[in-house]
Amino acid sequence: YVFSILLLVKKDALTGLLNRQAYYSETSRAYKDITAIVSIDMNGLKKINDTYGHQAGDEALITLALCFKRSCNVRQSAYRMGGDEFAIVCYKNTEEEVLKLIERINEHVGKTNYTCSIGYCFQKDGRIELDELLKVSDEKMYQNKAEYYKTNQ
C-alpha cells in the first residue's frame, strides 16, 4: 500500500513518466553515476492547444512520453519536468550511448505528427554539478529550439 502511494507521488498523472519530484529525489541519490542529462522540449504545444484544444495537447504529450520511454534503456530514465519539458537522465553511459538515445528519440518522434527540440550535456568523470549539467543541457535545447523556429516559421 505504501509503495503504491509512493509510486503515485513520483509519477506524472498525464504521461506516466516519473515527475520532477522523482527527478530531484533520484538524481540526488545516484549523482555519481550520472554521465549525461538530455533536455527535451516539445515544439508547438501552445499552437496545438489553441487550435485543437487541450485534450489534443494532452494526447500529444502522452504520445511523446511514450516515444521517450521506448527510446530509453535500463540505464536511462525519462522524466516529465513540467508542461512540455522533459529530461532523460543517463547513468554510466558513454557519449556514444547518449547520442544513440537521441537518435532513437528522433526516430520514434519522427513517426508522429509532433517535433521536439533536444539538448544534452555529457560528463565522463562526475565533476560537473547536477544543476550545471541540467543548465547546459537546457541551454543547448533552447538553442536548437530557436533554430527550429527560425527555419519553420
Where do the protein language model's features map onto the residues?
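Residue-level recognition of strand-loop junctions within catalytic nucleotide-signaling folds
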Residues: D50, V89-N93, Q123-K124
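Short catalytic/binding micro-motifs of nucleotide second-messenger systems
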Residues: R70-R75, L101-T115
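Conserved nucleotide-binding and Mg2+-coordinating catalytic segments in signaling enzymes
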Residues: I5-S25, I40-H54, I62
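Regulatory sensory/coupling modules that transmit signals to nucleotide-handling catalytic cores
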Residues: Y1-L6, E107
